[in-house]
């Protein structure tokens, strides 16, 4: 009795989108979605800066107590007592202080495990620093970028 060939039980890997020319106005953009958003903001003559500002959402510090941490690829823990804990920074994709908006494009990113907590910390930073009147957008595709641009244009017309 012959056996049937086994099916491949592993999932096929999703292919990431091929990147084309991602250079605009001398700036190297990181994804097709960022490029599309950049082009749309320019087309609608909306004032913005691309990755022009980095926010420090938590200052660095030194932990005064005993601190051991695991080491990559080794079986033992390393003594990190007294070592500096680095600051936590966040750089949004598009910022406009004039029009009060921040856009963070998030396409298909398989392992952005730090983004959700970093984003929550950033929201707290905005509230604590009197920037809670900014419009925030996290579009994941071109349709959502279009919706983002429409919302910004609509809000700018209201304020004039």
Positions of the model-derived regions?
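Electrostatic, structured charged patches in enzyme active sites and in nucleic-acid/phosphate-binding
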Residues: 1-160
């Amino acid at each position: 009795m012959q056996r049937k060939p086994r099916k491949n039980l592993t999932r096929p890997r999703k292919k990431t989108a091929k990147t084309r020319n991602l250079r605009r106005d001398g700036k190297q953009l990181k994804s097709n979605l960022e490029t599309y958003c950049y082009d749309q903001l320019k087309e609608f003559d909306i004032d913005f800066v691309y990755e022009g500002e980095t926010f420090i959402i938590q200052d660095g510090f030194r932990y005064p107590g005993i601190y051991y941490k695991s080491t990559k690829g080794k079986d033992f823990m390393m003594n990190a007592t007294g070592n500096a804990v680095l600051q936590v920074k966040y750089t949004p994709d598009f910022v406009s202080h004039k029009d009060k908006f921040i856009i963070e494009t998030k396409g298909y990113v398989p392992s952005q495990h730090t983004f959700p907590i970093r984003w929550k910390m950033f929201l707290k930073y905005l509230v604590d620093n009197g920037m809670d009147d900014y419009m925030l957008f996290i579009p994941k595709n071109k349709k959502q970028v279009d919706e983002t641009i429409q919302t910004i244009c609509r809000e700018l017309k209201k304020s004039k």
